[in-house]
Amino acid sequence: MFDILWNVGWSNGPPSWAEMERVLNGKPRHAGVPAFDADGDVPRSRKRGAYQPPGRERVGSSVAYAELHAHSAYSFLDGASTPEELVEEAARLGLCALALTDHDGLYGAVRFAEAAAELDVRTVFGAELSLGATARTERPDPPGPHLLVLARGPEGYRRLSRQLAAAHLAGGEKGKPRYDFDALTEAAGGHWHILTGCRKGHVRQALSQGGPAAAQRALADLVDRFTPSRVSIELTHHGHPLDDERNAALAGLAPRFGVGIVATTGAHFADPSRGRLAMAMAAIRARRSLDSAAGWLAPLGGAHLRSGEEMARLFAWCPEAVTAAAELGERCAFGLQLIAPRLPPFDVPDGHTEDSWLRSLVMAGARERYGPPKSAPRAYSQIEHELKVIAQLRFPGYFLVVHDITRFCRDNDILCQGRGSAANSAVCYALGVTAVDPVANELLFERFLSPARDGPPDIDIDIESDQREKVIQYVYHKYGRDYAAQVANVITYRGRSAVRDMARALGFSPGQQDAWSKQVSHWTGQADDVDGIPEQVIDLATQIRNLPRHLGIHSGGMVICDRPIADVCPVEWARMANRSVLQWDKDDCAAIGLVKFDLLGLGMLSALHYAKDLVAEHKGIEVDLARLDLSEPAVYEMLARADSVGVFQVESRAQMATLPRLKPRVFYDLVVEVALIRPGPIQGGSVHPYIRRRNGVDPVIYEHPSMAPALRKTLGVPLFQEQLMQLAVDCAGFSAAEADQLRRAMGSKRSTERMRRLRGRFYDGMRALHGAPDEVIDRIYEKLEAFANFGFPESHALSFASLVFYSAWFKLHHPAAFCAALLRAQPMGFYSPQSLVADARRHGVAVHGPCVNASLAHATCENAGTEVRLGLGAVRYLGAELAEKLVAERTANGPFTSLPDLTSRVQLSVPQVEALATAGALGCFGMSRREALWAAGAAATGRPDRLPGVGSSSHIPALPGMSELELAAADVWATGVSPDSYPTQFLRADLDAMGVLPAERLGSVSDGDRVLIAGAVTHRQRPATAQGVTFINLEDETGMVNVLCTPGVWARHRKLAHTAPALLIRGQVQNASGAITVVAERMGRLTLAVGARSRDFR
């Protein structure tokens, strides 16, 4: 049963607690030292940083040339270089302009424009339109011509963007634009320039298929539609044997129609090194291997950018084509400096402006939140200040839109709350957008909005995930699909997908593709063990990594405009029904100035809503979250025991390890707990100093007395971004707006010039205000600079801390409802349904399997809200929709009396009936699971619409019952959950004989003792802040164990530790601080008869 691999000697003791602190938390860095090692496994900003030029030497060019036909990786598998790489190569080669002409979209336009602005390359915007009726990925060489359009200035861009959007929406589904050639003709209006294109262009295709006469007719049609002055014949040379002959024939057509000739490279990558990758990507697009697709794929070896000199040599017989390309590029070039649309005017009552209506709503809300003005002068003074800034920046409409969205949620009983820096605003609090009082919590409004900041404010609205679609559709309905769209999320190649697709392109079998991809680590994207993976697969996978694969939907970003969005960016259908999405991601939208709203789905809000409903339904208790006593000691005592499975934000192994050391006693302790276990505070070295001060081990000290007001709440340890701003105010006399400038200058997008100016301002202010010597100011400024990248927003932590308390309160007082609510809100949270159910059982909650006569479609409560019943939707093959139908039939026509009665009233397939039988859901008919399985086929095939006698026999022979182990295995197979057992309990006798300690007994083990533990692996984590340390969470029937694996131990047991569903581990206990961790030394395989799956996170 046990395959124990003892590979580590006892002499290799575990690291000391001090060493663990260093690994887990890093050290504070000195000013000017980079926050991250660029090559390490380190945290990354979610925002795309400003484009940084590579500083490559430029070769220049004596021949003027502009590339007018280039595809980037945003042609999705038809380009092997990013827009930035194309611009960099164009700059190196000295091109006078570069056109980006991706397929059917402007996906890379913003990145292209940003890079070009930095490198002083003139930009031409265009697209290659696929006029065929099939998707580009459906076959190796889809039929239908292409039309290459170049926009002549901003108006041409707007017209092109509109037509791209119209075609995508007319196609009715993602990836199948449907163009109307006549509509394109009319839309051009002299603002486009048409190139005859590559081999798929009208003229080239006609020449290949019908000879010169056909080519002449195709060119005549283009000229008739777009006029001779707006059409040019395109010549390319990719090394094909017929290139010269075709180019000569095409050039011969020009004089007859009075059109120009331009030379292009038809580039699909920046330089020749990407040629092999481009072919591999084309094969993936064709859904074939390189070998099988070779007959269809166009030659791409020469499809890279070239200098003017090289183009002049290639087209020495037609030099005017190179000159004309440069001239046309100059005429078409413009910067992407579009005027960003504003929000649409908000519909306000008669007699009001947006400013006056916002003031009216805010003052009404303030009276509810704060009482009359005389009772809260500070609050009303702050509100007046904020309203003045909002009016000055012309943002009242933004706040009215957000208020309208939250009003819709409240009116439709949908839980929502604003979070992030919006919680710094008293206006947002008065409007009911946020639940945090910024005045009482002394939060700085300027962290959210100030006259010195660029762009609109950023308000994130968390919405219960199961109801978010209603809110999104409300926005579409209110503002119109032409004026509202979701922001895209560009799905890029990561390690596993890169290896799988490149192995496929090279013709390896699906099984081999899968096996090699699984060798790639979840955490680094690198192959942990490259043995057996061919070098060519690794080489191509490395090249394609981080290139775009396809377009997805951002988790919640929506853009609303006062004009059709397609005037700025094309819109297309998403895979999800009734969702239209921009072709740009959130960073693109921000760069252009589009106003974005984040409507984010939060599973815990759904779970809290379900818990409220279940408690009301089964216990008759109406819970008002806003009225819960946030000082209730029992809640904090439970959290201090790290009894937090399922509790929002504090259920991870890192949070569980911190809770017993922090010992939360008041609400603000939860705010700190939420903020502590984050990449910023961890990398900044704030975690353990705070805890030592919190527990009285270290004294609370300040570099200067002026720091005390800002840092008093966190015991002198900086945790929050707002504290950096407050320190600038208190120490150096900065205004709040100046303090926000300092925070931003020191942040992830550091500005050397701004930092130099503000540094001088800080020193001068502190000398003048406090007479502080320079050595003290040096130390304070150094700490600010080191901390700037790490601070967590206090407003964000405050918003989340409320949800921590609410969820912990339900876990403490209504554990059955809490468990059922979490199961109903899946997928969400840190733990699997199996672990949630096991934790509920450890808290005395009885959990029952699904039953066709007792279960709802989802998990619910029974026995006055003290027990949990699993839902029918959790049964394999059923799903929520069929489960709802089954429950509706039972509700309408009474309980099912037998299996034949069930299958006659609800249409079920044989696999579905068998899954119900396996889950024990048919036990209400007096049948054992084996008997129900035997009868499943006959019942499912013996419906009233079948002729009698053609189904299976309904006779059930005498069958033995299932053992407890078999029942547990059946439960897990059918629902993923064993309601009344845990897999390890069936091995307990053998484990006891081996000296394996149950999880619940680890608390009595002395610090430093070695133990043998075993359990199912629930999680594997390698945080970016842990410098290679991997954490494994083991669970047995008594509880959970946090296991720490040093890089050496992980390397020695890599395959076992990475893949085994259950492990036997010998290691050393560390529990001196009250948080129990086992530092692994040896690992062995534990074979479970009942299946278990882990959730592995980065």
UniProtKB/Swiss-Prot annotation:
Name residues in a coiled coil. none
Map out region (Disordered) in residue numbers.
34-57
SMART domains (alphabetical)? POLIIIAc
Q: Which domain of life is it from?
A: Bacteria
Q: Where in the cell is it found?
A: Cytoplasm
> Which Pfam family, giving just one, matches this sequence?
HHH_6
So what EC number does this one have? Answer: 2.7.7.7
> Catalyses which reaction?
DNA(n) + a 2'-deoxyribonucleoside 5'-triphosphate = DNA(n+1) + diphosphate
Q: Which UniProt keywords apply?
A: Cytoplasm, DNA damage, DNA repair, DNA replication, DNA-directed DNA polymerase, Nucleotidyltransferase, Transferase
Q: Mind telling me what this protein is named?
A: Error-prone DNA polymerase
Q: Which organism is it from?
A: Mycobacterium tuberculosis (strain ATCC 25618 / H37Rv)
Lineage start: Bacteria, Bacillati, Actinomycetota, Actinomycetes, Mycobacteriales
